Amino acid sequence: MAKGKEKSVFFCQECGYESAKWLGKCPGCGQWNTFVEELVTKQSGDAARLMPSSEPMTLQEIYYDDVLRIDTGIHELNRVLGGGMVPGALMLLAGDPGIGKSTLTMQLTGSIHMQEKILYVSGEESRQQLKMRAQRLGIGTEQLYILTENNLSVIEKHIDKIKPGLLILDSIQTVYLPEITSAPGSVSQLRECTGKLLQWAKGLGLSVIVVGHVTKDGAVAGPRVLEHMVDTVLFFEGERHNHFRILRALKNRFGSTNEIGVFEMQEQGLREVHNPSEVFLSERPQDTVGSVVVPCMEGTRPVLVELQALVASSPYGQPRRMTNGADYNRTAMLLAVLEKKMRLPIGNHDIFLNVVGGLKVDEPAIDLGIIAALVSSMQNRPILKDAVVLGEVGLTGEVRTINFLEKRLIEAEKMGFRVAVVPAGNLKQGQKFPIEVKGVRNVGEALRVLLGGA
């Protein structure tokens, strides 16, 4: 076999764009100073072998079993995945350091309903450290095999020997292929290692979960092609000093990307939170100025969240604007609506907006709730008692209709709320709701109902 030739190539660390020379600005993603030099080996002859080919088949000839999904034993994870794990799927689990990625994957090994063996490969921890975590989480299954290895070729030999049904790799940034001369974690290694894992998943029907690091900006570390190659991208998020964790699907070929799973970090590991609304509102004081409850939709699940606003006179020439959990640009737009349409001199005030519990909400249905919290804080007047607020606000101050109103109100009724201020366009003649509903057409009407006691 002819020996491969080495050549120097420059890769963009953000998107994986390849160039023969160094470039200041990447033509692929537009980022500056992201190119690094790597040595790659160009294979010749039949060295670059492809995956085994298959014969073309018609749709009628392809066998498909809808109940083929594997129950992970973790209800919140099943929800995010779309009903369970699909055999042969390659999944990427990313999140900040210390957020609980390794804890979640280790708990999965003890709860999953699977007869096949499970191979847990770690390139970051020793066998003793992994056993300590397993004992702390109460995991003692005989199906679980632990391997500490960074060489993907060695890992392949153990897969051929053990023949597992599930492979967990922690993490993709620490493994390497020996035929690639660049260091582990480089663009070339990440791309080639992911390609190898994809070959195993599709060729062997092996479910693969890969743990990935994130950058300081919160994006998945490595080239963008990494996210394109996998079937599912899961993101585990939460505040470092907050014990709640949110699992989201940023990409899912086998289900929705709008669902979330809620967990609580405890000494014994991650505990599922089946009723997030109760958790997020558990410490909410009654009749508090600047606080409002909004029923949000996370996929098909209604979740009640508390919005808190603090409006104070600014001692500086340039007022401060800070948001946590809500979209900054949308909040700025709503402030402009208040200034223009309601004649409120809010522009010279410091504005602080927070979604309690570390949840990130980006749907327009919280617009009216944001406005209500801001005006309540500015005028030092509490919101209407036992009320929830929802509605999208337009640039002219009108309150627009929203989706899934009945689901949101049913959740509000479960949590003891008795009144809902909603868009008038959502109300139909003769329609019944579980709680009292007040329809409003614009921001002025909504504020009179919420702050005037009407």
Model region roles, listed by residue range:
Residues 127:
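Divalent metal-dependent catalytic cores for phosphoryl transfer on phosphate-bearing substrates
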Residues 96, 123:
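P-loop (Walker A) phosphate-binding loop of NTP-binding proteins
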Residues 147:
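Conserved SAM-binding strand-loop segment of SAM-dependent methyltransferases
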Residues 3-14, 18-79, 86-92, 99-110, ...:
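Peripheral, non-AAA+ core regions of ATP-driven protein-machinery
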Residues 118-122:
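Conserved RecA-like ASCE P-loop NTPase motor core of nucleic-acid helicases/translocases
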